[in-house]
Swiss-Prot record:
It is found in: Cytoplasm. It comes from Borrelia duttonii (strain Ly). The gene is uvrC. GO terms for molecular function: DNA binding; excinuclease ABC activity. One of its GO terms (biological process) is SOS response. PROSITE patterns: GIY_YIG, UVRC. The UvrABC repair system catalyzes the recognition and processing of DNA lesions. UvrC both incises the 5' and 3' sides of the lesion. The N-terminal half is responsible for the 3' incision and the C-terminal half is responsible for the 5' incision. This is UvrABC system protein C. InterPro entries: GIY-YIG_endonuc, GIY-YIG_endonuc_sf, GIY-YIG_UvrC_Cho, RuvA_2-like, UvrABC_protein_C, UvrC, UvrC_RNase_H_dom, UvrC_RNase_H_dom_sf.
């Protein structure tokens, strides 16, 4: 079995033993095959059997990833499979010519509604139930409904009662106009049954079965038994298809201590067509996370906003609804409703969120193992510390340290440093790297704290050698692995190796390193900007200096130390201000410089 198939097999071991659909992807992220299963783990495992056909083996040689969507029943899986195949038209699926769809039960919107089987949806106010995969079951249940309840079968009015009235299967609404209340009660009972409330009807069938068996009418007993089975199967709520001519999204968030999994189930023209998964590491509380995610997700430029956005808990959404509608120039609703259908859909979203988290963690673990192999490490890089340097034209140089554990950010391990070894205006990333590496690991050694498994430097060979020289000086180069990742080329550099390592963009090990590098870069820049902004805001404390002029002082004159190198005339000339204001700026810089005697480690 090829390596990629081994990796896939490990992924499948995490699949649940529940019903659902699976999508098989190629290396270029194209869907090759879509299938459904009663037991996802068991079904997908079958593709790895030695007894599979030649065509299946060709398929599996091209599959690099398998994504699944769990459902609440096998029926739902079958319907979802149908919808997905129609949407994506995968290479290895049969192209079906018959696209008439599955039948449904229609209750018309007439004064005296009729009930019948249909495959066509008419948006006239009629109510629909289904669709139903097993047509035989549907026919048996419709026959039971028609015999149990006195519903209208005729389309036209008549002066005389119809045949069904004489058979006791019609109230006589075809010739009478005074039966509206009584007829409405019949219809409500039928809807009650079609919504899954079948216990009373099942009890009636049991009684009838005993009666016909007593009379030795075994043929009738067999039919009643089949009807009972059909009623049970058909009562399973078919939530994959919602008979609404609109688009709806259902959002669910599964929170854990380290990660939030966000699932959006997308319905279009009444059909579940897509699942969108997002992972979030923010520290927002649940209500705030719902609000923040909806705002960012639905206001993004290319996002098509649905008619309705269903959420899984009640919160105030008036402001974000208004914001989305104004920005997108649409009219959408963000709603929370505890209907039976909505609860079922949220249950499905919950199941998919939990499964996505398992898959995500599995992929992270696989990436860490991959990274160990590529970097030729002796142990897994479970803890990675990443460093980056930031400055603005050599001023206020800072360093950042970020920590990742098993491929995920560990915020408690974040640090920022002010670099002391460089004077203002001096640009030397290697010297800055040496300082921060020395400060960080001298502290860990002195305090006998645990060392990371891997150090990542944002930069190239020069920055790597600078950091490695410090590790050698501390005599810990054998205890910690170290590498550098260059930005544009995305080349990995290792100590004592002339050639860098170039990985494919989709390589999971590279993605882990990129995440660490990008987070260190973000953290360093944020801290550097904060320091510059603090100086700018401090300048506004000078009487007569507003925010715009403070910004100009920082840009033209620089930091407090830079100002101390200038005399009042030079300040006045550079800033194009009078000597009095120049004196104020010089005096303020002297005061601030004296007050700035503080620890550089934040």
């Amino acid at each position: 079995m090829r390596k990629h198939l081994n990796d896939l097999y490990k992924q499948i071991e995490k699949f649940p033993k529940t019903s659902g659909c699976y999508k098989m992807y190629s290396k270029d992220n194209k869907i090759l095959y879509i299938g459904k299963a009663k037991n996802l783990r068991s079904r997908v495992k079958n593709y790895f059997s030695k007894r599979t056909s030649h065509k299946t083996k060709i398929l599996m040689n091209n599959v690099t990833n398998i994504e699944i969507i769990t459902t609440n029943s096998e029926y739902e899986a079958l319907l979802l499979e149908c919808n997905l195949i129609k949407k994506y038209k995968p290479t290895y699926n049969i192209k079906l010519k018959d696209d008439k769809g599955y039948p449904m039960i229609r209750i018309t919107c007439e004064k005296y509604p009729r009930i019948f089987k249909t495959r066509k949806i008419i948006n006239d106010g009629s109510e629909y139930f289904g669709p139903y995969v097993n047509v035989k079951n549907l026919d048996l249940v419709l026959d039971l409904i028609n015999k149990t309840f006195k519903t209208k079968k005729c389309k036209k009015k008549s002066k005389n009662p119809c045949l069904y009235f004489h058979m006791g299967q019609c109230l006589g609404v075809c010739y009478r106009e005074d039966l509206e209340d009584e007829y409405r009660k019949e219809i409500e009972q039928i809807k009650h049954i079609l919504n899954g409330n079948i216990s009373k009807l099942l009890n009636d069938i049991e009684i009838k079965m005993k009666e016909v068996i007593m009379k030795e009418n075994f043929e009738a007993a067999i039919k009643l038994k089949e009807t009972k089975k059909s009623l049970i199967e058909i009562s399973q709520t078919q939530i994959i298809t919602k008979i609404d001519k609109l688009s709806e999204d259902y959002l669910y968030i599964h929170k854990t201590n380290s990660l939030n999994t966000i699932v959006i189930l997308k319905y279009k023209d009444g059909k579940l067509t897509e699942k969108d998964i997002h992972f979030d590491e923010s520290i927002y509380e649940e209500d705030e996370l719902i609000e923040k995610f909806i705002t960012q997700y639905y206001t993004s430029p290319n996002m098509i906003v649905p008619d309705k956005i269903h959420i899984f808990k009640k919160i105030d959404t008036s402001n974000i609804t208004k914001l989305i509608n104004e920005l997108k120039n649409i009219k959408t609703e963000i709603i929370y409703k505890e209907t039976q259908d909505n609860i079922k859909i949220i249950e499905m979203a919950t199941s998919n969120a939990k499964l996505a988290l398992i898959t995500y963690n599995h992929e992270k673990n696989k990436a860490i193992e991959n990274l160990k192999t590529i970097l030729e490490m002796k142990k897994l890089p479970k803890t990675i510390e990443g460093f980056d340097i930031a400055h603005i034209n050599g001023y206020k140089t800072v360093a950042s340290l970020v920590t990742f554990k098993m491929g995920k950010p560990f915020k408690d391990g974040y640090r920022v440093y002010k670099i002391n070894s460089l004077s203002n205006g001096e640009i030397d990333d290697c010297k800055a790297i040496k300082e921060v590496i020395s400060r960080r690991y001298s502290k860990l050694i002195n305090e006998q704290l645990k060392l990371p498994d891997l150090i990542l430097i944002d930069g190239g060979k020069g920055q790597l050698n600078a950091a490695y020289s410090i590790l050698k000086g501390l005599r810990i180069e054998e205890k910690i692995a170290i590498c550098a990742l260059a930005k544009k080329e995305e080349i990995i550099f290792l100590p004592n190796k002339n050639q860098g390592i170039k990985l494919q963009k989709r390589n999971s090990a590279l993605q882990v390193l990129q995440n660490v590098r990008d987070e260190a870069h973000r953290r360093a820049n944020n801290f550097n900007n904060k320091l510059h902004n603090n100086i700018k805001l401090n300048y506004t404390k000078i009487k007569g200096i507003g925010e715009q002029k403070a910004k100009k002082i920082l840009k033209v004159l620089g930091t407090y130390k830079d100002i101390l190198l200038l005399n009042e005339d030079e300040i006045a000339t550079k800033m194009k201000i009078n000597i009095t204001m120049a004196n104020k700026i010089k005096k303020f810089a002297e005061e601030q410089n004296l007050n700035n005697k503080q620890n550089n480690h934040i």
